[in-house]
């Protein structure tokens, strides 16, 4: 894995026996450019970019073994590492939360840019795939992102039956919570450092 710093962004390249990924995460564009090859995953990523205000350019996203689980998990790893490299958690608000309705679904997201990776959600999906994406990919992506960004993320589903609506409500709330957590702040952690 290689990391290259830019003025307003970070390029991460990850090449394993299973996948090849090259992405750029920036603070400028606020949208997804390019494709992972998984339409619904692209939809969720674009949703995250729109509501977080972050830009994501996918230059390369190829599966060498044809297993979507690996592709989506490694994409989360790459994006999480880019996020950690791009931001100094000691100079931002750190905490963010948002609750977003989408039709019958209502999901809240609670974020701490703590340096301590932890992911939790209180819901499971009722189908095996949403459009062309295996539902296990949602958690695999989030775990990859959280572990390498070194942040804490909780999702709480208040209501929801339609898995498309639930996942999109979750990703919108995640984007908004991240945007809030990244607001500039002079308030320091009581510990004095974020590892």
From Swiss-Prot:
Example of a GO biological process term: L-histidine biosynthetic process
EC number(s) recorded for this UniProt protein: 4.2.1.19
Reaction catalyzed: D-erythro-1-(imidazol-4-yl)glycerol 3-phosphate = 3-(imidazol-4-yl)-2-oxopropyl phosphate + H2O
UniProt keyword Phosphoprotein present: no
Keyword Transferase among UniProt keywords: no
GO molecular-function terms, A-Z: imidazoleglycerol-phosphate dehydratase activity
Listed GO CC annotations: cytoplasm
Main location: cytoplasm
UniProt cross-references to Gene3D superfamilies, sorted A to Z: Imidazole glycerol phosphate dehydratase, domain 1 (3.30.230.40)
Keywords associated with the record: Amino-acid biosynthesis, Cytoplasm, Histidine biosynthesis, Lyase
Compartments, as annotated in UniProt: Cytoplasm
Enzyme class: lyase
Pathway: Amino-acid biosynthesis; L-histidine biosynthesis; L-histidine from 5-phospho-alpha-D-ribose 1-diphosphate: step 6/9
Similarity section: Belongs to the imidazoleglycerol-phosphate dehydratase family.
Protein's recorded name: Imidazoleglycerol-phosphate dehydratase
Lineage: Bacteria, Thermotogati, Thermotogota, Thermotogae, Thermotogales
């Amino acid at each position: 894995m290689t990391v290259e710093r830019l003025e307003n962004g970070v390029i991460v390249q990850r090449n394993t026996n299973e996948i090849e990924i090259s992405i750029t995460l920036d603070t400028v564009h606020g949208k997804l450019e390019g494709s992972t090859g998984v339409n619904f995953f692209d939809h969720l990523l674009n949703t995250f970019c729109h509501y977080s205000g972050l830009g994501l350019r996918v230059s390369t996203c190829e599966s060498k073994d044809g297993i979507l689980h690996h592709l989506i998990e490694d994409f989360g790893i790459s994006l999480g590492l880019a996020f950690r490299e791009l931001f100094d958690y000691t100079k931002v608000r750190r905490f963010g939360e948002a609750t977003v309705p989408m039709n019958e679904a209502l999901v809240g997201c609670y974020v701490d840019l703590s340096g301590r990776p932890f992911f939790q959600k209180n819901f499971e999906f009722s189908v095996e795939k949403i459009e062309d994406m295996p539902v296990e990919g949602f958690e695999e992506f989030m775990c990859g992102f959280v572990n390498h960004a070194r942040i804490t993320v909780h999702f709480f589903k208040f209501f929801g039956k339609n898995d498309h609506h639930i996942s999109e409500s979750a990703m919108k709330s995640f984007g908004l919570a991240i945007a809030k957590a990244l607001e500039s702040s002079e308030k320091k952690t009581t510990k004095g450092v974020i590892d």
